[in-house]
Amino acid sequence: VAARGGTGYYMRGTFTHHNVDFTKDLFHMADDLGFTELSMEPVVASPDSPEALTEDDLPKLFDQYELLANDMLRRQKAGKPITFYHYILDLKHGPCIYKRISGCGSGTEYMAVTPWGDLYPCHQFVGDPAYKLGNVWDGVTNTALRDEFKLCNVYARPDCKDCWARLYCAGGCAANALHATGDIHGTYEYGCKVFRKRMECALMMQVAQRLDPELSQNAVHFESDCDGCGEDGNVGVCKN
């Protein structure tokens, strides 16, 4: 972090059923601790866990996301913007169509490496023998599992067919789907509802920035994190 000049990292937290008023934590990170690049993730837990989010929590969460979006616009107008990871949205130079379909690429484009050299699709699968891909010495030996993760894309999930946000989440997180449905190709519906709300807020902020010159002037701009092909995201086809 020091080598990057104190940039390029996120202060990340997790909210549960016990703290659905998560903006309090985010504003504490920003106002009291001085962090400007923030993220707050909803917990994914067994339905019988006391920490698990419930359907009754959703209206409160939606209010929190709207509160956060409006407060971010206020801060931006004051020249003191903060970044919320899930509101980063570039409508002109977004991910290429390949990334919009395939998502994070867990198990195929990247893997988690444990301290003892084992390979897993991502950190959320570490320790589960059924999801061990191989090791750093022998490489990927469980090719059947790797091929199964290749199918983790937006078109492999029938429930995604009519969702307006499907090309922004690419079908969602395989680990979350497994924990919620028992299948990496399943659909974590609760997570879908939360994701769509975040997208609505991100789009609202984009509209506000275009309508208000002050907001546009102080907008935070992001560079693409993909250097594979150089194509413009929304229309380009990845050549990797």
Regions found by a protein language model. Give the residues of each.
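Radical SAM enzyme [4Fe-4S]-AdoMet core and its adjacent flexible, acidic
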Residues: 3-110, 128-132
